[in-house]
Regions:
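Short, low-complexity N-terminal intrinsically disordered segments enriched in polar/charged residues
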Residues: 1-31, 130
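A solvent-exposed, acidic/Ser-Thr-rich amphipathic alpha-helical stretch
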Residues: 24-78
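A beta-strand edge to alpha-helix "cap/lid" segment located at domain peripheries
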Residues: 2-5, 54-130
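Short, mixed-charge, low-aromatic patches
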Residues: 8-18, 40-44, 58-62, 85
Length: 130
């Protein structure tokens, strides 16, 4: 069975975000992209445009010095929607933080128009970033 093209796009987006690749994100995200981010990681809130997504993920990459291990549990697509679940392990100064995170993506044709990111880290996880 082949992979849905929107799943491929989500995988490309993840790689681009973690790599800070704004040029690739410009081809993946719609011009009016919206990002909704909830959880105990830095900078929760609502953002417009790829810069907001890069700002949020950039803070996490900076705090962990890139010590981020993501394991996609599933990623499924139908019509203009994608749902994804991942297990993340972040490392910082000899400590580790694990979370199970949920993502929902709304597509406009072949580009991501809106993204919801919900961090499933345990209570008190904010201290990991201080």
């Amino acid at each position: 069975m082949s992979q849905h093209p929107h799943v491929t796009t989500v995988d490309r987006m993840t790689k681009a975000v973690l790599g800070g690749d704004a040029e690739t994100l410009g081809t993946i995200l719609s011009n009016d992209f919206r990002f909704h981010y909830r959880g105990p990681y830095p900078k929760p809130g609502d953002y417009t445009g790829p810069d907001g997504l890069l700002e949020v993920i950039g803070e996490i990459v900076k705090a962990t010095k890139g010590d981020i291990d993501l394991e996609q549990q599933f990623c499924v697509a139908t019509d203009g929607w994608v749902a994804e679940w991942e297990h993340a392990v972040l490392g910082r100064e000899g400590r580790h933080l694990e979370s199970d995170n949920a993502f929902v993506y709304r597509f406009d044709r072949d580009r991501i128009a809106e993204m919801w990111m919900f961090i499933g880290a345990p209570p008190g996880s904010e201290a990991f970033f201080v």
